[in-house]
Amino acid sequence: MTSAELKHLLDEAEKSPRQIAAAVSGLPEKILRYQPAPGKWSILEILAHLVDIEILYAYRMRQMLADKNPTIAPIDQDDWARNLGYLESVPAELVALYGLNRHYNLRLLRRLTPEDLEKSAFHPERQARVTVADYVGMLSGHGSNHLAQIERLKKEAR
């Protein structure tokens, strides 16, 4: 990954918390809790997921940067949504936590060297190694993917 590619991905990642905050600002509970089908996430669950995955990515990237030959522990994001109280969350807190965690991750990522970006961990679900650079790419696109999902849910719920 070139320094220009890294800068572009991090600049995109920086926009996400503001975009998510704007998309959910002032939404009534009915829309925040609307589920398009059984087992499909509401906007509230998406917000909680964004926070948890930001924390998860933070941990995984730090493992790669600091530990010797780490292995990533897989998760089931639907189990997390069901078992971690996503529907009992406070939307404004989730928006704030997402922004703060993203900010903290970006502070770390902006000071990495090209060698740091190639540090890796074994991902058992993929049966392959993944790098910090791979996670930068995932982090950069994660919020925008869910922003599109939030916009669709807002239209469906009205």
What are the language-model segments listed below?
Residues 2-29, 51-59, 63, 137-141:
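Alpha-helical bundle segments that constitute or directly flank the non-heme di-iron/ferroxidase center
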Residues 23, 27-30, 68, 112-115, ...:
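A short secondary-structure junction motif
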